[in-house]
Curated annotation (Swiss-Prot):
Belongs to the fluoride channel Fluc/FEX (TC 1.A.43) family. Its main location: membrane. Pfam families: CRCB. Keywords: Cell inner membrane, Cell membrane, Ion channel, Ion transport, Membrane, Metal-binding, Sodium, Transmembrane, Transmembrane helix, Transport. It catalyses: fluoride(in) = fluoride(out). This is Fluoride-specific ion channel FluC. GO terms for molecular function: fluoride channel activity; metal ion binding. Disulfide bonds: none annotated. It is found in: Cell inner membrane.
Length: 228
């Protein structure tokens, strides 16, 4: 069997399972009144496509089999345009025209923005402009932010199950937790002496910490739902 085909099949299986777990976890938490799960899947997948395509093709020049497994297999199965189309059609047919239009607008704008941000961050990393953020204390700080976000998401899901706050209040709590993680990360970078030179590095630190907070908070929520 062609090695690239095997790599694509393996990556595709992992991507499909990841999409199933993440989207179902989000739908179980937020409900199915709006396609939150598919939107998150496509936006996060677009970011990873932009970031990893630059890193794997332009910077490290990995073998075709590795690129095929990740970019074609995993991300191809993880993201889903067909589900986005079906969910949007369902919203139109049930008369939720505003939700359908909002889903189209958010999906197009956020996915394009995410793939651009991912590609730009990867290119800046390649020329060393964000090296200070992931070297020395910066790496430990971002690692701690990821761990704290995971624990916060897990604890929040358990608290939500007991308190019964409702989707709106739960969303506000998660936005507040995300803000705390981002602010705490930036403060820790400054306190430990990590040099943020120029607007791009400051913006890069904000983007990385916000992305890490959202991803690991969501992962904690999904894990807690699965454990429950």
């Amino acid at each position: 069997m062609n090695l690239s085909l095997f790599a694509i099949a393996l990556g595709g299986a992992a991507g499909a399972l990841a999409r199933f777990w993440v989207s179902n976890g989000l739908y179980g938490w937020l409900g199915r009144d709006f396609p939150h799960g598919t939107l998150f899947i496509n936006v996060s997948g677009s970011f990873l496509m932009g970031f990893l395509s630059v890193m794997m093709i332009q910077r490290f020049a990995l073998a075709a089999e590795y690129r095929a497994a990740v970019l074609v297999g995993f991300l191809g199965a993880y993201t889903t345009f067909s589900t986005f189309s079906l969910e949007t059609l369902a919203l139109f047919e049930e008369g939720s025209l505003l939700k359908a239009a909002l889903n189209v607008l958010l999906s197009v704008v956020l996915c394009l923005a995410a793939v651009w941000v991912g590609a730009v961050l990867a290119r800046r990393l390649a020329v060393g402009e964000i090296a200070a953020l992931v070297g020395g204390p910066g790496l430990r700080i971002f690692g701690a932010a990821c761990g704290m976000s995971l624990l916060a998401g897990f604890a929040a899901a358990l608290a939500f199950a007991r308190a019964g706050l409702g989707p709106q209040l739960e969303s506000l709590v998660l936005v507040a937790l995300t803000g705390l993680v981002v602010v705490g990360t930036l403060v820790a970078l400054v306190v430990t002496g990590t040099e943020l030179r120029g607007a791009f590095q400051l913006w890069g630190a904000f983007t990385l910490s916000a992305f890490a907070a959202v991803v690991f908070l969501s992962l904690g929520l999904v894990l807690a739902r699965g454990a429950g």
